[in-house]
Amino acid sequence: MKRAIVIPDQHFPIHDESAVKVVLKAIEFVKPDIFINLGDVGEWSSVSGHKYKRRKRPPLEYQLPEIDEEIKAVNKQIDRFDKVLDKVKCKERHILAGNHDEWLDSFVEENPYLDQYSFKNACKWEERGYEYRVWNDVLTIGKISFVHGAYTGLSHARTHLERYGTNIMYGHVHDVSRHSSTRLLDGNISAWSMGCLKDMSAEKNKWLKGRLHNWNHAFGIVTFFDTGYFQVEVIDIVKGECSLWGKIIKG
């Protein structure tokens, strides 16, 4: 038997500090064998295509200091996770790049001589010991797969299940949702949307222009049995605290 902790979109440095602290404490408590980051690790507003939508893009020498500062801020937060993962001796670590993370790669496509700014290189994933997957490349362990997230809309969990046709866990949409189906040969299969760890306030999400959302703070625990089957626990984080196996964890 092995256990994994799965975290959804963090959007560092626009994260919810109390939610992140809950997850860090949960890692210490659970002591997982596997750690899976579903991506959108950074907000990456410095390289967002929306940044210069209504104004002219400045010369590169004006862009780089802001990009460098955001990379530094994101790495500082990743370091916090690596520190606690090292402490509990969790060696198997996976990173599944998200669409926001892909913005760094798009920046490098425009500036191919700046390869050090790719998401993989800027966050030093290989150096950190993570197995790296590009945006929506699928990770499969036993009888469940993991991906950043490919579909949105009201029925995104159902759409992920129908398109992938297997047990699938993803982030991307920031809400907690599940859809299940039964197949004649495969039995019950499900899709889990895992919420986010992002600051959900209107002040930090001005692009919503005051619209309400259905986002939730959460993380997942997956227990893998020797048969390849598994058990999923979606742990909701409510106002900076959660209940985990009879223990109250406060961020």
Regions found by a protein language model. Name each.
Residues 1-79, 247-251:
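N-terminal active-site segment of His-dependent metallophosphoesterases
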Residues 143-235, 240:
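Conserved beta-sheet core of the metallophosphoesterase superfamily
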Residues 35, 93-95, 191:
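Hydrophobic/aromatic residues located in beta-strands of well-ordered beta-sheets
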Residues 16-17, 45-49, 104-109, 157-158, ...:
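A short acidic (Asp/Glu
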Residues 47-135:
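Active-site neighborhood of divalent metal-dependent phosphoester bond hydrolases
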Residues 8, 38-40, 97-98, 147, ...:
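Active-site flanking residues adjacent to catalytic metal/cofactor-binding acidic residues
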Residues 29, 233-249:
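Polar, enzyme-active/binding microenvironments
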Residues 1-5, 138-145, 227:
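Beta-strand-turn-beta hairpins that frame and shape the catalytic cleft
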